[in-house]
């Protein structure tokens, strides 16, 4: 429990370098140390910001943000803020990309644990690695954005 008997939540997540620019983790993705993420909560009705906190990832690409209090009437999400390096620093911004990881910060939804796991978020590498077409073939995917496939 947090201050004043409120619920205290621990939002945990991971940041990776999307080395194939496909917006999910593959065997050639790397976890990012020193990446900054922000947890932002907004009231569903008023649209006003009710909570904001930043965290920096550790050497395994993991972060934890403590949130004191219930945010049942809010929409809360983790967004990428800053990459530790230029080589992998692009934030995905096309319509289909997952720019934010939504988290529920209330105990009124049947979730008993105080730990909330956010989906992993990835910065895009400037250009896909040369082995990406091979990696995608293993996954039965053949279209690597920005790469030239050879016949």
Curated annotation (Swiss-Prot):
Keywords: Allergen, Disulfide bond, Glycoprotein, Secreted
PTM note: N-glycosylated. Contains fucose monosaccharides in the glycan structure.
Superkingdom in the source lineage: Eukaryota
This protein's record includes keyword Glycoprotein: yes
InterPro entries, A to Z: Pollen_Ole_e1_allergen
Cell location: Secreted
GO CC annotations, alphabetized: extracellular region
Keyword flag Glycoprotein: yes
Tissue specificity: Expressed in pollen (at protein level).
Disulfide bond entries: 17-88, 20-132, 41-76
Glycan-modified residues: 43
Family to which this protein belongs: Belongs to the Ole e I family.
Protein name, as recorded: Pollen allergen Sal k 5.0101
Species of the source: Kali turgidum
Organism ancestry: Eukaryota, Viridiplantae, Streptophyta, Embryophyta, Tracheophyta
């Amino acid at each position: 429990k947090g201050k004043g008997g409120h619920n205290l939540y621990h939002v945990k997540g991971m940041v990776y370098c999307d080395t194939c620019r496909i917006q999910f983790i593959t065997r050639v993705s790397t976890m990012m140390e020193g990446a900054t993420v922000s947890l932002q909560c907004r009231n569903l009705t008023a649209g006003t910001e009710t909570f904001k906190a930043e965290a920096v990832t550790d050497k395994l690409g993991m972060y934890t943000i403590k949130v004191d209090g219930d945010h049942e009437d809010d929409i809360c999400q983790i967004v990428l803020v800053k990459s530790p390096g230029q080589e992998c620093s692009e934030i995905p911004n096309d319509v289909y990309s997952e720019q934010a990881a939504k988290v529920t910060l209330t105990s009124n939804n049947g979730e008993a644990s105080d730990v909330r796991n956010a989906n992993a978020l990835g910065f895009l590498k400037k250009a896909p690695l040369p082995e990406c077409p091979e990696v995608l073939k293993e996954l039965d995917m053949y279209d690597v954005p920005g790469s030239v496939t050879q016949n």
